[in-house]
Amino acid sequence: MEEQIEISIRDFNQNDLNFILSKWLKNYKFSSRFTKKIKADIFYKWHHMIVQNILGRNTANVLIANPIDEPDVNLGFICYEKGDAKVLHYVFVKPEFRNFGIGKRLYHAAMGDNSTAFFTHWTYPVDTLEVKVPNLTYDPYRI
């Protein structure tokens, strides 16, 4: 059983934007099989625009995990959409806070039950997530 730490989960605000962009881009660049093969200048230019596009949608939501007593300290986030279908775009938890159940709690806060959902960014941790969430389907075209 994984150890848990007390966190609060809140909606993101504009003060969180740099954290979200930097962690999403840097982490995805080095945690995906195919992005490692893209030259950094090409990846950061184009994927930054993709992330900005996702965040700018009316249907996009971002939740932030913080220590319960430190609302300005970000431990991680999840970006998702709930519309005709549930779409998970990205989950990030700072490495030193992984294996405390933060990602799982963000996922359940955002996506609810284990009903059918899609995800758009394949990273190495998704390999284990697919086993835990069998109704999760990779669909990069929902970006």
For each of these PLM feature ranges, what is it?
Residues 19-23, 49, 105, 109:
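Alpha-helical elements of Rossmann-like donor-binding domains used by nucleotide-donor carbohydrate transfer enzymes
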Residues 37-69:
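Active-site rim helix/loop that mediates acceptor-substrate recognition in acyltransferases
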Residues 23-39:
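Helix-loop element at the rim of GNAT/NAT acetyltransferase active sites that forms part
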Residues 85-90, 112-143:
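Conserved GNAT acetyl-CoA-binding A-motif
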Residues 6-22:
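A short beta-loop-alpha structural element at the N-terminal edge
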Residues 54-59, 81, 112-114:
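Flexible, charged surface loops at secondary-structure boundaries
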Residues 62-64, 71-82, 87-92:
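Conserved beta-strand in the GNAT
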Residues 93-113:
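Conserved acetyl-CoA-binding loop-helix of GNAT-fold acetyltransferases
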